[in-house]
């Protein structure tokens, strides 16, 4: 269909004669530290940076914040870091679909474990298979950028429900304002 996503740190200009030019405005300055750094030091520094990032986002909002919890590694880590940083009242939200044949439609069994372990205020939303297809075009029209897969519709439907309870959520995608 000719629509493609630009590379990170670039912008595109198109002149009146339809000449296209892609330009880079930013490149990450990623350099390895000088000297020998142990695996333990990398782990400690990564933990510090992740904790700082999550805490910064929690403290930057003047409204209650939630977490979109799939039960996967990334969203579970966000919940764990929030709890570790002293946030007692963590709101979490999960979505699931009906099972089809042998394929599980929800990952509630995983998110439930995180909810139990970290004692979050949790809401689950189960979407019927009949609801997904009619909402697909609406979900695509409201996306900031093209996404493919069942989770694209899931993210949209979950966001619709979550927005009734909070306006800012953290997710494994990025911090999102609903």
Which residues make up each language-model segment?
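N-terminal segments that mediate ammonia production and transfer
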Residues: 1-40
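ATP-dependent adenylate-handling active sites, centered on carboxylate activation for C-N bond formation
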Residues: 16, 29-178
């Amino acid at each position: 269909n000719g629509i493609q996503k630009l590379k990170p740190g670039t912008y595109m200009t198109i002149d009146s004669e339809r000449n296209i030019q892609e330009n880079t405005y930013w490149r990450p300055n990623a350099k390895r530290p000088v000297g020998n750094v142990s695996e333990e030091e990398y782990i400690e520094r990564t933990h510090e940076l992740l904790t700082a990032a999550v805490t910064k986002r929690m403290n930057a909002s003047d409204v209650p914040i939630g977490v979109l919890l799939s039960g996967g590694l990334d969203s579970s880590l966000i919940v764990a870091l929030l709890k570790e940083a002293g946030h007692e009242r963590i709101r979490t939200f999960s979505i699931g679909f009906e099972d089809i044949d042998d394929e599980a439609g929800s990952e509630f069994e995983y998110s439930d474990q995180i909810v139990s372990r970290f004692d979050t205020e949790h809401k689950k939303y189960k979407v019927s298979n009949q609801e997904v297809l009619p909402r697909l075009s609406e979900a695509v029209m409201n996306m900031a950028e093209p996404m493919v897969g069942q989770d694209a519709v899931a993210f949209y439907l979950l966001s619709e429900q979550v927005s009734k309870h909070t306006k800012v959520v953290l997710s494994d995608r990025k911090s999102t304002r609903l």
